[in-house]
Amino acid sequence: MNAPSLPRLAMVLGDPAGIGPELIARLLADTEVREKAHIVLIADEAEMRRGMRIAGCEFPYRRIDALETLDFADATPLLHPWLSQGGDEFPRSEASAVGGRYSLETLALALELTRSGRTDAILFGPLNKTSLHMAGMDHSDELHWFAERLGFGGPFCEFNVLDDLWTSRVTSHVALAEVPGLLSQERVGEAIRLIDDALRRSGLARPRIGVCGLNPHNGDNGSFGREELDIIAPAVQKAREQGIAADGPYPADTIFLKVQGDARAFDAVVTMYHDQGQIAIKLMGFSRGVTVQGGLPIPIATPAHGTAFDIAGQGRADVGATRQAFEIACRMGRHKA
């Protein structure tokens, strides 16, 4: 691959109190990773080197003090040192305002780099929502924070990815009792279009999308719930009329059987609520799951697991999901519109 075709990634550690520093260290110690992208890491240098010690590995890097121009002369990652603006030390293995504030500071820099065109995509280590809220973030999650920082008013949602299988959901972090009232043909259709667009941006020409029902056995033809008949099926039909290869609705207890093995029927599954997809994905491969911040104008990916405070600093963190997030960020950055 010629150097000009390499995607340019802005990378941050996530919450320093968790496993992010050791995951990023283990990722960048892999020569193959460094040869797949031009990387600028925004991080406290002491925390990054601590991550190296915990992971038992090192990687070369070149320090840069300014971010106005990025000179990707070779495969060596760039490091832009960023100290906590509060000047406080980071607590270990626990949520804190210091860790949350630092996470937001470094993410804001990565967003600015990518929004301005100096990088193509963002990869960040695990965040802790309690830390983010302690630091003053008043959004329900980082996806809404990203959208506000970018001034983005269009539709967006969280995608979960396992290997080559993508999932999205019509509703997300809401009480289960609220889900039926939040469903509409427009919202189901929007979720289908968002994941179709994201897969195309990651290089797949015509994604096959399976859509999940809401009720047991798809409502059994209206016997216990009409959402499949009145909302989901019409939304799927409209998506098909728009040229999207969507199919469904399928019962929630069988649709994920259709995406296993070599004869997989779908590239993506759209679910109606959070746990319909999350339970299946985590059972299929918890250590490889990736979260993509879908619908935003720039590609953003992160491992789907959390900060794992219980094992942070022990060198036991599995880099598998972070490696998958890196691969997805590279693909989406390369195909960014």
From Swiss-Prot:
Miscellaneous information on this protein? The active site is located at the dimer interface.
Q: Where does a divalent metal cation bind?
A: 173, 217, 274
Q: Which organism is it from?
A: Pseudomonas aeruginosa (strain ATCC 15692 / DSM 22644 / CIP 104116 / JCM 14847 / LMG 12228 / 1C / PRS 101 / PAO1)
The molecular function GO annotations come to: 4-hydroxythreonine-4-phosphate dehydrogenase activity; metal ion binding; NAD binding
Quaternary context: Homodimer.
Cofactor: record remark: Binds 1 divalent metal cation per subunit. Can use ions such as Zn(2+), Mg(2+) or Co(2+).
Going by the UniProt record, its keywords in alphabetical order are: Cobalt, Cytoplasm, Magnesium, Metal-binding, NAD, NADP, Oxidoreductase, Pyridoxine biosynthesis, Zinc
Q: What protein am I looking at? A: Putative 4-hydroxythreonine-4-phosphate dehydrogenase 2
- GO-annotated biological processes: pyridoxine biosynthetic process
Recorded superkingdom: Bacteria
